[in-house]
Design a protein with these regions (language model features):
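Glycine-rich loop(s) and the adjacent beta-strand/alpha-helix scaffold that form part
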Residues: 136-182
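N-terminal glycine-rich dinucleotide-binding loop that anchors FAD/FMN and/or NAD(P) in oxidoreductases
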Residues: 19-54
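General beta-strand structural signal in soluble alpha/beta enzymes
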Residues: 10-12, 75-76, 107-109, 139, ...
């Protein structure tokens, strides 16, 4: 807006700018994905078409060009993920702040409380400290996922005040809690190149992807699990079953052949040693107990 010649005022309730941006991507800041709009939409679990017009007007290529234009060199990593070359989120927020200052954007340390309307149009924003007259207002408050960074749901509340229907937000890109004790027994174990699938209560597969995951003391986490969480609806009301294929490159028949071959060739060794050639070491005793096998 400022680059287009507008006089811009930014209302920021935090004591510093970019508080949430600085912790994204584990502090590295995954700024976008280097792919087409169609590819981006294909990875949005629900109602991706709603974002089409916005993404077409400002594509990931536009975002990359903008950031590099204000002095943030970028790199593309596995999965088309784009990061600053420095691997430092503060470089991104710092460059944005400098650009704001150069364009004369005014920063007010204040929280927006409500939108003021006159004759059917928004005329001002009411802050906690004062009123801000405005010819146009952009709501860019974030969601409600991390209140400590300022994402407290203010945008939902102000939009609802103006008559918009708000769909109840649900967690996405989050770890999952499991009631299976095996998870705690294998906490810290990371799995790579596995196939994770999720089935709903009717047995329908709602998610299935290859990648990496991690067992924790409360359940499972890691890239695959975070992606899966976006596909699991209303988990406070429903349960889901997760299946992990440790050898996705092998068919069930091929895997059985390999297991039988290992058992024949290592008939003088105990089961734990035999399975160690097929499973991660820390998983073997857990699986033996689960299956009632003597290690």
């Amino acid at each position: 807006a400022a680059e287009g010649g507008g006089q811009v005022t930014l209302l920021e309730p935090n004591d510093r700018l970019g508080k949430k941006l600085n912790i994204t991507g584990k502090g590295r800041c995954n700024v976008t994905n280097n792919c087409t709009v169609e590819e981006l939409l294909a990875h949005i679990p629900r109602n991706g078409k709603f974002l089409y017009s916005a993404l077409v007007r400002f594509t990931s290529a536009d975002a990359m060009a903008f950031l590099e234009g204000i002095g943030v060199p970028l790199k593309t990593e596995r999965g088309n993920r784009v990061f600053p070359v420095s691997d430092c989120a503060f470089d991104v927020s710092g460059a944005l702040k400098k650009r704001m200052e150069k364009l004369g954007v005014r920063w007010e340390h204040d929280r927006a409380v409500s939108l003021l309307v006159e004759e059917g149009a928004i005329s001002a924003v009411q802050g906690e400290k004062k009123e801000y007259p405005a010819a146009a207002v952009i709501l860019a408050t974030g969601g409600v996922s991390y209140p400590g960074t300022g994402s407290t749901g203010d945008g939902y509340r102000m939009a609802a005040q103006q008559g918009h229907t708000i769909v109840e937000p649900h967690g996405s890109l989050v770890p999952l809690v499991s009631d299976d004790s095996c998870c705690e027994q294998m906490q810290g174990l990371a799995l790579k190149n596995v196939l994770l699938s999720a089935q709903n209560e009717k047995g329908k597969t709602v998610f299935s992807e290859f990648g990496e995951m991690l067992f924790t003391h409360f359940g499972v986490s890691g890239p695959l699990v975070l992606s899966a969480s976006a596909h699991l609806r209303d988990w406070d009301k429903h349960t889901y079953r997760l299946s992990i294929d440790l050898k996705p490159a092998l068919s069930e028949e091929k895997l059985e052949e390999r297991l039988l071959r290992e058992l024949r060739e290592q008939s003088n060794r105990n089961m734990e040693n035999v399975l160690s050639s097929l499973l991660p070491h820390s998983m073997v005793p857990v699986m033996c107990r689960r299956l009632g096998l003597s290690p």
